[in-house]
Amino acid sequence: SGSCEVKTCWWSQPDFRVIGDYLKDKYDSASEMVVEKHRESRGWVETLRPKYNFFKAPTEKDLVYYENSPNFCEPNPETGSFGTRDRICNVTSHGIDGCDLLCCGRGHNTRTEKRKEKCHCIF
């Protein structure tokens, strides 16, 4: 009689919330960069450096950018964005659907509607 031992190892993804929080932290601390062109023996080379000298150079794990994101609060025909004006928001939410964030700090109007609809209920 023989015995058999099976050992299984695998990697698993962290919880989606953990990944989202990690990426949000990276986004919030992203470094703005500028592209510098300089001549080397093989021709022109482009490198990125921090836009402001008082910031340390980013590491390989830091998030960097060299163009500002568009302002999604305002309409932009080039990108097809309608902006956030007249959007429905959630007054009680502090998330992305909340009025403070969605209305870009412009304030919001509260409107109460009463509707009469057939509900097709069966009793």
From Swiss-Prot:
UniProt subcellular location: Secreted, Extracellular space, Extracellular matrix; Secreted
Entry GO MF terms: cytokine activity; frizzled binding
Keyword Disulfide bond set for record: yes
Source organism superkingdom: Eukaryota
Post-translational modifications reported in the UniProt record: Disulfide bonds have critical and distinct roles in secretion and activity. Loss of each conserved cysteine results in high molecular weight oxidized Wnt oligomers, which are formed through inter-Wnt disulfide bonding. Palmitoleoylation is required for efficient binding to frizzled receptors. Depalmitoleoylation leads to Wnt signaling pathway inhibition.
Keywords: Developmental protein, Disulfide bond, Extracellular matrix, Glycoprotein, Lipoprotein, Secreted, Wnt signaling pathway
Example of a GO biological process term: canonical Wnt signaling pathway
Signal sequence coordinates: none
Glycosylation sites: 90
Residues covalently joined to lipid (O-palmitoleoyl serine): 1
Disulfide bonds: 89-104
GO cellular component, one term: extracellular space
UniProt xrefs under InterPro entries: Wnt, Wnt_C
Entries under PANTHER family matching the protein: PROTEIN WNT-3A, WNT RELATED
Family: Belongs to the Wnt family.
Known function: Ligand for members of the frizzled family of seven transmembrane receptors. Functions in the canonical Wnt signaling pathway that results in activation of transcription factors of the TCF/LEF family. Required for normal embryonic mesoderm development and formation of caudal somites. Required for normal morphogenesis of the developing neural tube.
This protein's name: Protein Wnt-3a
Gene name, Swiss-Prot/TrEMBL: WNT3A
